[in-house]
């Protein structure tokens, strides 16, 4: 399903946490400790749930339905490939489980580099290629409980794409199905699926940095 239509249908139920979003949160907690986040941008923020309790954080998303569902005043409707922000405005940029929806993410990476302050960081997560190989898909349940598959492009070269845009790789880490994911399975698709998927990587995360002399 086209991402615009998908997020319009997903908006009413987006507040219900999914396993990829949960693992994304675990990765963020593990990888962002000690990094500056005084001026934070969540690019592709959805309903803005992640930044709701972060003072001064800003979000941008292409879906007006998602933004309306969140009801925040520090979010903007817009495309992460052409953002209405000043160059060097943010010391931390998140783009979490978003870039896989783009056929070509290079324009987004270039924008991240532009609006990131020199020495600042970009945190990116995506659906893991191992999950795709195992038959998992990017899906959601609408209000009627119908499951929809969202447009997704498998990609293993995020580090190369970010480098082309002027960012350098700092760290990468995988989020796998483990004990913390058990309840999602038990209350969802079942214990047998949990045992089948145990150890499977579902999310891959990257921390990039804009070099101090980038763009100078």
Residue ranges and their predicted role:
Residues 1-35, 49-53, 66-69, 123-151, 176, ...:
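Conserved class I S-adenosyl-L-methionine
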Residues 41-82:
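Class I SAM-dependent methyltransferase SAM/SAH-binding core
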Residues 94:
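A conserved beta-strand element that flanks and buttresses the S-adenosyl-L-methionine
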Residues 97-101:
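Short catalytic micro-motifs in class I SAM-dependent methyltransferases
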Residues 106-118:
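A short glycine-rich, Lys/Arg-flanked "PGG" loop and its adjoining helix->strand segment in the class I
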Residues 150-166, 170-172:
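Short alpha-helix
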Residues 190-195, 201-216:
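C-terminal lobe and adjacent flexible extensions of AdoMet/dcAdoMet transferase-like proteins
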């Amino acid at each position: 399903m086209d991402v615009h239509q998908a997020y319009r249908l997903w908006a009413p139920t987006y507040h219900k946490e999914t396993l990829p979003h949960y693992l994304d949160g675990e990765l963020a907690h593990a990888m962002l400790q000690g990094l500056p986040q005084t001026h934070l941008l969540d690019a592709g923020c959805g309903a803005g749930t992640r930044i709701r309790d972060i003072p001064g954080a800003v979000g941008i998303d292409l879906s007006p339905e998602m933004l309306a569902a969140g009801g925040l005043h520090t979010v903007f409707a817009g495309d992460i490939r052409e953002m209405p922000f000043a160059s060097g405005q943010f010391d931390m940029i998140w783009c979490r489980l978003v870039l896989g929806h783009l056929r070509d993410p290079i324009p987004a990476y270039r924008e991240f580099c532009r609006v990131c302050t020199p020495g600042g960081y970009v945190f990116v997560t995506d659906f893991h290629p191992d999950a795709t190989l195992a038959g998992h898909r990017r899906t959601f349940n609408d209000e009627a409980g119908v499951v929809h598959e969202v447009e997704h492009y498998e990609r293993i070269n995020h580090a190369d794409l970010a480098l082309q845009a002027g960012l350098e790789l700092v760290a990468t880490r995988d989020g796998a199905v483990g004990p913390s994911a058990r309840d999602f399975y038990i209350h969802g698709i079942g214990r047998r699926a949990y045992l089948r998927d145990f150890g499977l990587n579902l999310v891959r995360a990257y921390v990039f940095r804009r070099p101090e002399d980038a763009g100078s």
